[in-house]
Amino acid sequence: MDEQKGDRVMTKETVCLRIEHHAVLFALLARQAVELCGEKGKESILRGMTVYGKERGRRMACNARKRGDEINTMTNQAYGEWKPDFDGQMEFGQIHTQPTLQTYIAKCAWCDAWEKHGLTEYGRLYCVNVDNAVYQGYQDKYVCTQVTEPMSWGGPRCEFDWGCPLTPEENEALAAKKKELGASCMKDFTFHTAHLRATISRILIEDLGDDGQRAVDRALAEFAELFGQECLDVLDTVPEEEIYPKEAFV
């Protein structure tokens, strides 16, 4: 029998994390890093997000290569690793495909989570470079540029320019590829939250030493207090070799 406890979604067998958990853990790590180390903490969080994003992009590219697909802007749009928790949670799409592909996000579950928990000041650091970092991890020919101020920084919606056009034929191929792949390359947010914890923690400790470890410990304790110890413990069930598959990290 399913059981609901506050912000926790539980069954007797498992705990399933959502975008909210992912968003809040990042913001807690960012807050602790900034409060303990000021500008150095902020710089470390931003570096951590760039590393984290590039790691996601490398996994995506690995999936594309394993299926015989070229590494380009079209396939980058097809090989995403996540989907919303439920219909209507996010609102996003294309603005145009020529002269370059531009996309938008008009409703964001990360922004909603940060606002709910009073963490937007720190959560918005997630948005500074994550989309470009994922893109750069996938390929290194083009840059993803934020056309507008992100919603978390006060903008009306997030808009991105991917630096490369999609022809009508490529856009049709994109729709077909998404349909073909379905959810086969996607990971749940227990996985994504475990990846976030692993990479951001590693970078904070590398950059900030004992203060970085202290920031991580405090943030994880806050996370467990907020969502329950089981929501922290479930992160340990995600194998490191799944987060960092050898074929993507050679």
Question: Residue locations for each model-derived region?
Answer:
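N-terminal accessory segment detector
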Residues: 1-100, 109-110, 114-126, 133, ...
